[in-house]
Amino acid sequence: MVRIWFLAMMLGLFAGSAPAHAQDQAARCAALEGGALAALPSAATYIVKAKAQPASAERQAYCAVEGYVNPTDRFGMYLPIDHWNGRYLVRGCGGSCGSAAVELACGRHVRDGYACLITDMGHYSTLVDNTWVDNNLMGLVDFGYRATHVTTVAGKALVRAFYGKAPLKSYFFACSTGGRQGLIEAQRFPEDFDGIVAIAPASLHPFGGVKPAEVSDIDAFNTGPDDRPILPNRKALLIHAAVVRQCDLNDGVRDGLIGDPRRCAFKPSQLLCRTSDTRSCLTAAQVAVVDKLYTWRGAEKGSELNWIGNYLRDATLPGEVSKPVFDLAVGRGDPVVTETMIAPNNPDLRAFRDHNSRLLLVQGWADHSVMPPPTIEYYETMATTMGGPAATRNFARLYMIPGMDHCSGGEGASAIDYMAAITGWVEEGNAPEYLYGVHPLPGAPLDYFGIDLHRLDRKWYGFERNHFAWTGPGKTAVSKPTGVTTPVQPVQPLGATLTQAITEADRLGSASGYSRRSILSGIEKAIWQTFYQAGADDAAQRAAVAAIDRTGLSPVALEAVNRMSAELALD
């Protein structure tokens, strides 16, 4: 018979100082299974699985827990067995959520000593499946705000039950839908967290700039009479190069990044073809498509490489398009649901501030999915509401990252240690004037810091930048206050670099649970961006694709390579 132990009994059993031996903690982990936590009167919590995981070469031992909060809020949690740093971390999800992917969310954090939790937000689905919304008001409530809060409270109860004491500090860290979760927590449940990192928060549409729209509309205006795209992937490289040539130095630094796209006066008509040779220019129809992407869609100057696989469909796949996730309720024409349950648009954070909590709000300038204007406008509105920029910066700061795509990726320095920044601010009072990040080498895993280091100074109104250079591990650091060094690239043929980029894009997409189509788009994007970084012309592109080592590539990666070969064969 399943044992049911209520929280008071568990606390009585597990009270006291941390055990001297990991074996005792492993036994405590197993004892959690089958328990029930009365953490909230209206949110009973049940632990369905708890098992100690032994230490390995990659991490120390930890307790893996699975449970749910009534009615359907599933969560996964990792608790370090003998190396807890005293902190509790909740990770958010992406898109439509629907999966408590605890290893993906918490694996690296438990290695650093965090007790870490993630929830599925109350439903089963893929990242882009919104069918769960139909006739599911409770599901919308959970997705909107309840699930994050009740599972956060449950996680704190588990920390106390397992370690015999409450966490010293509690943090939230996530992007996109997860960024929305973070803002909702600051607005609705200001005492849940001491520090929140909210990156590219979704569903801030009511604050302006970009209205939700179906991607099929983009597909429609980019489809010609022959059912092929008017603006193919390869033209994104041409447009991006023109934007960089014109606007790179607007911030005083030649680094291939657009520091503030609002100051870039590039117009697509500048690339209008003057002859019948259209390979290095834009036709009138292509100019019209680019204009719509900048104005109707709201894409920023400098984001062009991130259109590949997102706005621009492959020439060999008529009628198919990768669909980013948009605001669920707005897309269904229900603004009441959006305002009350989904949109994190309340600028009044007095309770969060008075709890002495801190907020890092982050947005990539080249984000293809969550456009920068709503994030900027939300912060500016918050600053006005909270007594002005100076008063707001005491507890909440906005960081705009040049060249960064949605959550990460792109050409900017998107590999950033956000947890070091937020814990330093919360626990030591070191408000981060800068975020330090790197742009990994093509094909490198996300935790490889092997390229020039960018120091990004973010002021809420100006988004100014300073830089210094770091040439990579084992290399001599060269300080350049007004610029950065040329990235250190591996000495290998372009085909080998492409193989690495394809393999890494495939790995990341598969690990994140993306659909086949999304993984395919990610691989194509990696190929084109590698071409751009290498400055490869048409002949070099064809040769590089032909030289890709196909041994060991997955079926989806092979399909991407075949499609790229077909596209490069077109005029």
Region spans (language model):
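Glycine-rich nucleophile elbow surrounding the catalytic serine of serine-hydrolase chemistry
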Residues: 175-184
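C-terminal subdomain of alpha/beta-hydrolase-fold enzymes, centered on the catalytic histidine
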Residues: 294, 298-460, 467, 491-498
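Bacterial N-terminal signal peptides
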Residues: 5-16
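Catalytic-loop region of hydrolases
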Residues: 22-87, 91, 100-105, 240, ...
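Short, solvent-exposed loop/turn and secondary-structure capping segments
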Residues: 75-78, 100-105, 127-131, 183-188, ...
